[in-house]
Amino acid sequence: MFTSELIIKRNIKEKNSYELAAPLIWQDSLGVIITVPAGFVYDGASVPRVLSSIVPRFGGRYDRATALHDYLYTAGFLSRKDSDKVFYEALRSDKVRWVQARVLYYAVRIFGKKHYKKGEF
């Protein structure tokens, strides 16, 4: 579960991105804590343009989960598969509907490989 709120500011250096103004803290079901540092830049939900009306880049219940997931992919200290599992757990923790959480989870499983550990979102 998240133990902090998502506090962001628009990143004027990169189009369509935000910067964390404060750390974002996640604690998993085993008590492991992951801290996304203040200053981390992310681009929200990376979805194809055709789906952006259904899943906007920003503004959903999934915002904290997408920031966490982008950080996990950039940091690379968890495997891609484990990063995606944390993403799904974070989505459900923030009350994202089961169907939407599954769609987002499978989207990162299918299309996320090229972004893992590269910081290219």
Over which residues does each language-model region extend?
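Extended terminal accessory/targeting regions
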Residues: M1-F121
